[in-house]
């Protein structure tokens, strides 16, 4: 049977459900697909379909994630839901599931709990731009005042992590009752999705961002010059444009004199393309793997940064023993390993710790031996002798 063509007539947005264990994230996800399926905008999925998500590997880390897709009247959504708390931490830090926004699920019966806080903090640190709150299990709370108190508590919590607590929509839902087909609760799911359509901004497309390509390989072509190959991460580049080479050595500018893909010459390369760029006046030894080609001035090289890191457990192929401040691993950034040092660290909530155990999540300060093009939200892996022992995301650039 011929595959259906993916219709790109609606803007695409990536979202996910986050929140404390057993507050009903997966049930709510199932309810969304069931309610939208009645309008022909989704395929119905039940709790078991979503809960039995297969394992995936991202940067050498095993993560369980369920992916569902659905549409509203105005948008196409890809929605991720994770069964376990550890899966969320790994997912958000590795960027396996980049979220343009998230539905924070909080049970009205419990109010905000430990992981509610942790997921809000994680969302802030890894740069999830917008949230919508689903107060779930509202069918189980008879007293409207209790629901209002929980709502106030959630809003204050969001404020304390620098989300606009007063402005974020909070919708009272019951995932279970909506799944069971009760009309008033189905209407609440529609209200929730209308809030998501409204409050989660449409992401800027990769192709509209400033050009960036990480260099994977370099060739010199006799009589023509030097070609750098790689995958264009974002933006686009045209023949004749000036670009900058950033990282490892001093930054320098050059002009793109050719764009080549599958041995064909192109006028321009775009985000997602694997291509070669012919660079004017550049020698093969001027450029190496680990550098990036960028729109001039759009990104700068740095050596010192703070990051959020998940350290792999022994069972995940990580270290068997703890490490201490002063530990010197390799940081795998885009296409290359750069040696660096973890000069300091704390537990993820900022409390002091003496050492880092496999399976921990930490905030760390790192210092690289040579500058690398870096920006907030950039992902990296921490490696030791070629095997991944941790995954991280840059939360703040120091110098």
UniProtKB/Swiss-Prot annotation:
Region feature G2, mapped onto this chain: 60-64
InterPro entries, sorted: EF-Tu_GTP-bd, EF-Tu_GTPase, EFTu-like_2, EFTU_2, G_TR_CS, P-loop_NTPase, Small_GTP-bd, T_Tr_GTP-bd_dom
Protein's name according to its UniProt entry: Elongation factor Tu
Lineage: Bacteria, Bacillati, Cyanobacteriota, Cyanophyceae, Synechococcales
Main location: cytoplasm
GO cellular component entries: cytosol
Stretches the record annotates as G5: 174-176
Function text: GTP hydrolase that promotes the GTP-dependent binding of aminoacyl-tRNA to the A-site of ribosomes during protein biosynthesis.
Assembly description: Monomer.
Organism encoding this protein: Parasynechococcus marenigrum (strain WH8102)
Family of the protein in this entry: Belongs to the TRAFAC class translation factor GTPase superfamily. Classic translation factor GTPase family. EF-Tu/EF-1A subfamily.
Pfam families named in the record: GTP_EFTU, GTP_EFTU_D2, GTP_EFTU_D3
Residues reported in the UniProt entry to bind GTP: 19-26, 81-85, 136-139
Region (G3): 81-84
Binding residues for Mg(2+): 26
UniProt region (G1), positions on chain: 19-26
NCBIfam families: EF-Tu, PRK00049.1, PRK12735.1, PRK12736.1, small_GTP
Reactions this protein catalyses: GTP + H2O = GDP + phosphate + H(+)
Keyword Hydrolase on entry: yes
Entry keywords, A to Z: Cytoplasm, Elongation factor, GTP-binding, Hydrolase, Magnesium, Metal-binding, Nucleotide-binding, Protein biosynthesis
PROSITE patterns membership: G_TR_1 (PS00301), G_TR_2 (PS51722)
Subcellular location: Cytoplasm
Source taxon at top rank: Bacteria
């Amino acid at each position: 049977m011929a595959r259906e063509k993916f219709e790109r007539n609606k803007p695409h947005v990536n979202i996910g459900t986050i929140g404390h264990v057993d507050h009903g994230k997966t049930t709510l996800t199932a309810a969304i697909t069931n309610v939208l399926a009645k309008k022909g905008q989704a395929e119905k999925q039940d709790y078991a379909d979503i809960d039995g998500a297969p394992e995936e590997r991202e940067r050498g880390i095993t993560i369980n994630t369920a992916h569902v897709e659905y549409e509203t009247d105005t948008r196409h959504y890809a929605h991720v839901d994770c069964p376990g708390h550890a899966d969320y931490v790994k997912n958000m830090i590795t960027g396996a599931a980049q979220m343009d926004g998230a539905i924070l699920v909080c049970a009205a019966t419990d109010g905000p709990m430990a992981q509610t806080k942790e997921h809000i903090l994680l969302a802030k640190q890894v740069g999830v731009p917008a949230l919508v709150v689903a107060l779930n299990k509202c069918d189980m709370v008879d007293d409207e005042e209790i629901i209002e108190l929980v709502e106030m508590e959630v809003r204050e919590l969001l404020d304390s992590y620098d989300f606009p607590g007063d402005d974020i929509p909070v919708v009272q839902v019951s995932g279970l009752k909506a799944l069971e087909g009760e009309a008033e609760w189905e209407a609440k799911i529609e209200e929730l999705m209308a809030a998501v359509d409204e409050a989660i901004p449409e992401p800027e497309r990769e192709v509209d961002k400033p050009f960036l390509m990480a260099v994977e390989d370099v060739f010199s072509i006799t009589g023509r010059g030097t070609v750098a190959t790689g995958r264009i991460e974002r933006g686009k580049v045209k023949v004749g444009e000036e670009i900058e080479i950033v990282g490892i050595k001093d930054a320098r500018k050059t002009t793109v004199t050719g764009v080549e893909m599958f041995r064909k010459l192109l006028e321009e390369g775009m985000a997602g393309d694997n291509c070669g760029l012919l660079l004017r006046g550049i020698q093969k030894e001027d450029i190496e793997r680990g550098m990036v080609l960028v729109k001039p001035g759009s990104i700068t090289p740095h050596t010192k940064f703070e990051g959020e890191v998940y350290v792999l457990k022994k069972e995940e192929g990580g270290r068997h023993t703890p490490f201490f401040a002063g530990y010197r691993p390799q940081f795998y950034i885009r296409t290359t390993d750069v040696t660096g040092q973890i000069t300091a660290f704390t537990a993820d909530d900022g409390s002091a710790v003496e050492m880092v155990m496999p399976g921990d999540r930490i905030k760390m300060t790192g210092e690289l031996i040579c500058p690398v093009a870096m920006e907030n939200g950039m992902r990296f892996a921490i490696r030791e002798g070629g095997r991944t022992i941790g995954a991280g995301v840059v939360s703040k650039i120091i110098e």
